[in-house]
Regions:
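A composition-driven surface/loop motif
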Residues: 1-189
């Protein structure tokens, strides 16, 4: 979309040679089941809000990318900077996770924001990259976690942690969400 996408329900299975779901400005997912089986980047928009739903992403580059949309698979992958040092730092870019369950398997950064990331609820599991040129988490400003369930795995070459103002990690392990996680959802083949 050249502007905004709002997903409030439904079941989607997507495969793309570029972005699975792309909005230039705003992407809001409130509910539904989204299975992106193949893509360059899974979700991309300047401002991404995940409030609910079950999302599974398999991406050759970034799984979720809060960016101004300048990256593209045309001409090959873009070259990223070090952790928090992406080439397009923009404090207006954001990823907010308030609910839902999200599973990301990414060849590039698992989740990437050229601005900030905030997680207040839901479940996020990132099966990140194995090469040292990317990381499970990549953000330029901060990543604050005040609730939810967070697991990130990937290479340590560009590893970033959540910001110091976040709640202690042990609090995330108290309980799993009642809804099935995306990798537990069976899709038609």
């Amino acid at each position: 979309s050249n502007n905004a996408i709002y997903i409030e329900g439904g079941d989607m299975t997507l495969s793309s040679s570029d972005d699975g779901i792309h909005a230039d400005n705003t992407l809001v997912i409130s509910d539904g089941t989204i299975d992106i089986t193949k893509c360059y980047e899974g979700l991309e928009a300047a401002a991404i809000s995940i409030n609910g739903g079950a999302i599974s992403i398999t991406a050759s580059d970034d799984g979720i990318n809060a960016a101004d949309g300048s990256s593209s698979s045309e001409g090959g992958p873009r070259m990223g900077g070090g952790p928090g040092m992406g080439e397009n730092s923009d404090s207006n870019c954001s990823l907010t996770i308030n609910g839902g369950t999200v599973y990301v398997n990414a060849g590039g950064d698992g989740i990437d924001s050229n601005g900030y990331i905030v997680m207040t609820g839901g479940a996020l599991v990132v099966d990140g990259p194995t090469d040292n040129g990317n990381g499970g988490l990549d953000y330029n400003n901060y990543f604050t976690v005040t609730g939810g369930y967070l697991v990130v795995a990937g290479s340590s070459g560009m590893a970033q942690n959540i910001s110091d103002s976040s709640v202690p990690l042990w609090q995330y392990q108290e309980a799993l969400p009642a809804r099935p996680l995306p990798w537990q959802i069976q899709t038609a083949m």
